[in-house]
Amino acid sequence: MSPAIAVEIKRLPHAEGLPLPAYQSAHAAGLDLCAANSADAPLSLAPGCHMLVPTGLCIALPPNYEAQVRPRSGLAAKHGVTVLNAPGTIDADYRGEIGVLLINHGKEPFTIRRGERIAQMIIAPVVRAELISVETLSETARGVGGFGSTGR
């Protein structure tokens, strides 16, 4: 496992009393993010609809790092609820609130309660590319075959 990096986190007023993102097991890759909606106003996500769910958190990533917001497998498997823009990218220079864009692919409305774990956040290094314009690319066995060209 790589050594931990320091990431500053700011809790906004509507996240008071909620736990900070946390790893749920010794070797978990993602920190669970919780919904920071009002306790007396659960959110209802209708089938086929999407919604931006607040977390009440802002982070300051070190340069050359990103955070990815990904689905929680249990929500997807049990309820058909997933992150619409998975993975959502949080750049190192973004300082706004982390929002989770959820979509309900299930058949029933899904209720999002305050403090419910709704997504996971993976922090990873970023490699920046230097693009070089060329007239031709090197040949490969695959060539230009895409979408399904290597099998079903």
Curated annotation (Swiss-Prot):
Its cofactor is Mg(2+). Pfam families: dUTPase. Signal peptide: none annotated. Its EC number is 3.6.1.23. It comes from the Bacteria. Gene3D superfamilies: 2.70.40.10. It catalyses: dUTP + H2O = dUMP + diphosphate + H(+). Coiled coil: none annotated. Keywords: Hydrolase, Magnesium, Metal-binding, Nucleotide metabolism. Pathway: Pyrimidine metabolism; dUMP biosynthesis; dUMP from dCTP (dUTP route): step 2/2. Transmembrane segments: none annotated. GO terms for biological process: dUMP biosynthetic process; dUTP catabolic process. GO terms for molecular function: dUTP diphosphatase activity; magnesium ion binding. Substrate binds at residues 72-74, 85, 89-91. Belongs to the dUTPase family. This enzyme is involved in nucleotide metabolism: it produces dUMP, the immediate precursor of thymidine nucleotides and it decreases the intracellular concentration of dUTP so that uracil cannot be incorporated into DNA. This is Deoxyuridine 5'-triphosphate nucleotidohydrolase. It comes from Rhodopseudomonas palustris (strain HaA2).
